[in-house]
């Protein structure tokens, strides 16, 4: 019976993502934020449950990726699409379809992850959940500036950048703690501390800066490892 617990939690991730899809199409931003946050909790808990219960399975791995594709790939894409359709000039609304690149590259990222055993402790490219977190912050900024042309077009330009980051081979450190000791976890603790500060300062909009910081710290860590 216990072997089904991780997959059940993964299905809750998927369910939360499906609700977020409906809310995104309805323009309910805070509902989307709540559902994506809930999906992230379930995404963490299914892996934790699998480790504690020794309930790993090939099916669980594939199911987890399918759930992540919806919750962290499709949801931010629909949220961005809805906002771009609302705020772009009438003659430019077709540009909103660029948001659909997000789930395509998220699918490529997840497929790549599933066949690459070297990503157990570190990642290659931006994890799909991190992509979703970035877009939560970016969409909040977009809503706050609404008619600001600069923010609109920066959001559009950010799509191919984030898509590239998901599928590139840039080494990204994992946020999984082997222990709570400072040594060996310096970057993780630093990211957590700065993330809390950014959220207090900027609210949900700070999510974009947090993921930007994560990318920068990963680049610095990779360069340090080479030296």
Describe each region flagged by the PLM:
Residues 45-52, 108-114, 168-172, 219-227:
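Juxtamembrane membrane-interface segments at transmembrane alpha-helix termini
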